[in-house]
Amino acid sequence: MKIVSDAKHTGRTRCTIHCQNCSISQLCLPFTLSEHELTQLDNIIERKKPVQKSQIIFQSGDELRSIYAIRSGTIKSYTISESGEEQITAFHLPGDLVGFDAIMNMKHVGFAQALETSMICEIPFDILDDLAGKMPKIRHQIMRLMSNEIKSDQEMILLLSKMSAEEKLAAFLHNLSQRYAAPGFSAREFRLTMTRGDIGNYLGLTIETISRLLGRFQKSGMITVQGKYITINRMDELTV
């Protein structure tokens, strides 16, 4: 995706990172596009400054203006119940696109918030929609990404309804491992950018249960925990 330095304010030479040179392009919209198609996509992507930790990208009720591609960092999606309680629905990692929830009614039904300083590419939806009508590969890629999101939602439902607390956390760590591996990061060593409370909220478990299970996994030698850093020692034991 495109990141452009602001020469007017910095006095530096204009520098651009295009989709063709992006390390996560195979996970994102550019995947399978020709050079000409990539150029057209590149031209509609807007520069986005780094999103700071805790910054809200969009909130419930906002009109759909853009889809957001995550270049680095972690974003959480959540809803707020009538009683004011937060329910986390997803954690988005590099290569993920955020904002598909608004396509049906053209308004977002939930919130998206940065869990750490993150870099995102902003893709204006109306222009993307127009391009998709002209370029079958982009339309197919959008459908593929939306299908993957539906699949993740279905897996989440299964996770919460059929598994024990221990199985839920093991499956969560295994899923994170596979997702970090996709853009080329280590599958065995990674940082938990979300808090124990966030993980518990997502899995329907208490903070105490998350902490206790992480301690149990470490004691068994399955993982090593050092603050927010996780090392998976026996990957096969995390699969349910």
From Swiss-Prot:
UniProt keyword annotations, A-Z: Activator, Cytolysis, Cytoplasm, DNA-binding, Hemolysis, Transcription, Transcription regulation
InterPro entries linked to this entry: cNMP-bd_dom, cNMP-bd_dom_sf, Env_Response_Regulators, HTH_CRP, RmlC-like_jellyroll, Tscrpt_reg_HTH_Crp-type_CS, WH-like_DNA-bd_sf, WH_DNA-bd_sf
PROSITE patterns for this protein: CNMP_BINDING_3 (PS50042), HTH_CRP_1 (PS00042), HTH_CRP_2 (PS51063)
Keyword Cell inner membrane: no
Family matches, as CDD domains: CAP_ED (cd00038), HTH_CRP (cd00092)
Gene Ontology terms, MF aspect: DNA binding; DNA-binding transcription factor activity
Start and end residues of each stretch annotated as Essential for the oxygen-regulated activity: 15-28
Main localization, broad class: cytoplasm
One GO BP annotation of this record: killing of cells of another organism
Domain of life: Bacteria
HTH crp-type domain segment(s): 163-236
DNA-binding region location: 196-215
Pfam families with a match to the protein in the record: cNMP_binding, Crp
GO CC terms in record: cytosol
Compartments it resides in: Cytoplasm
Function: Confers a hemolytic phenotype on E.coli. May regulate, rather than mediate, hemolytic activity.
Note: Possesses 4 cysteines which may bind a metal ion (possibly iron).
NCBIfam families: PRK11161.1
Full protein name: Regulatory protein HlyX
